Amino acid sequence: MATARRFPPQVVRALDATKVLRIRAGSAPHRFIGIWVVVAGGRVFVRSWELAATGWYHTLRREAAGEIQVGTRTLAISARAVRSESVLRRVDEAYAAKYSTPGSVKYVRGLRRGRRRASTTELLPA
C-alpha cells in the first residue's frame, strides 16, 4: 500500500502556527472561508463545527478536493476521513493544546464530541 503524500515541512509549520486556515472545498468557484486547523504527528487535520449540508465539510467529503491558502500561496488539496481512534485522540489533544484560550475552550469541547469529532478530516496535498 502506498503511503499518503504529505505537505512539505515548511507548510506544516505554517499551518501549525496559524489559528485560522482559509479553505475552499470542492471544484466550484466560491470564496475561501476560515476554519480551525491542527497538526498532529506532522499530519494536517480539520473538523467541522456547523456540519451544514451545503457547507465546506460536506462538499469536501463529496469531492475530496479543494484549496487552502497558506501565507501567499494557494495549494490544491485532497481529503480523507479519519476513523482511527488513536489518530482521533491525537487530534483531540492537538485542538486542546492549540485552542486553549478561555473563549475557545467550549468550542474545543464541542469539537471533541459526537458528529463534530466524527467529521475529522485529514488534508493532503493534491
Q: For each of these PLM feature ranges, what is it?
A:
Residues 3, 17, 40-41, 71, ...:
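General secondary-structure edge motif
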Residues 12-13, 36, 111-113:
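Short secondary-structure boundary/capping segments
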Residues 30, 51-125:
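Short, structured beta-strand-loop surface elements
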Residues 41, 125-126:
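A short, structured loop/turn motif at beta-sheet edges
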Residues 7-10, 31-33, 108-109:
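A generic local structural motif
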Residues 1-22:
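Extreme N-terminal tail/first-helix region
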Residues 18-51, 57-58, 66:
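Short beta-strand segments
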